[in-house]
């Protein structure tokens, strides 16, 4: 949902694209948004993803790199923008997000022979020696920079392994994970901060994950760069995480609401038959190894929306970027709510239930799958005929904002 030229939204009645509509009627964006992000363009893309098969391990460029990649290779990088993303779980969600803590990577190099083999004994030892005793270095310190350099060297070695080497080593990794799951990565364990049960995860859990992913992408390099190098993440309904530019991630399963800056630039690493730009991938990543809990978002109250009858709740997911935020609304049957006009354009989707939305004499019926564009400064009233759940992506900037 949005104005991106790859797949612009369309007015159901007229067939006119939203891109053409906001170009013809710039007041639908408003001067502040047009001034900050350019005319004729919503600064965000809004998506619903239902993930049955893992999506590619990937990262997205920042603004400077996005411009460089687009200029050099417009076929694979169709625009010049960055693409930070936010994912909100509608159902239980699994994914990968950012590199594991360094001590976990060292432990896996020692406990998973195929991992050390594909990296190489000398390179694995060089990594373990470089990070030993400074795994929790202060961000930006000389030790932290050395850690990131060591992690980059390790990742580069993996991503540049030959296809035959990956195929053979991954096959043996999967065979051992399947036949020796109870002893896989013996001694490896970590406390899962994002798990609902606050449980300890062990090598057995990793073995089951690897064998499951292998049924989707047999003997793929993603089994190493995702399963062993990246944090495994679980989100439960209502939880969200923010995915920064230049950090690797992947979606494994679940239903999510996703919002991102308006870009289609993707640099892929694994679990994909598509183009993998290994050189740019290796050079662009931040190699941050911060706890994944830092990327989990805390929903905020939204005082500009409130129930006028019955039970209604609104919470805001507000990432640390200017392009977008998402407002979740939940209304119980027969409840009504009022939402003040927002200072920028927005798109609302209904994911559950039925009801109606109205403003200044105009009324539209809502049902699961309804998508509504709402102009800046438009107050709306929402009424639920049955339990109603909506998500509304929007942008608000001050007139002086320049990006």
Indicate residue ranges for each PLM-predicted region.
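Active-site region of the double-stranded beta-helix
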Residues: 1-239, 249-354, 359-364, 368, ...
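C-terminal helix/juxtamembrane-tail motif
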Residues: 401-403
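Conserved beta-strand position immediately N-terminal to the Walker
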Residues: 241, 257, 372, 380
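Noncatalytic modules at the cell exterior or secretory-pathway interfaces
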Residues: 238, 380-387
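C-terminal interaction modules of eukaryotic adaptor/scaffold proteins
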Residues: 371-378, 388-391
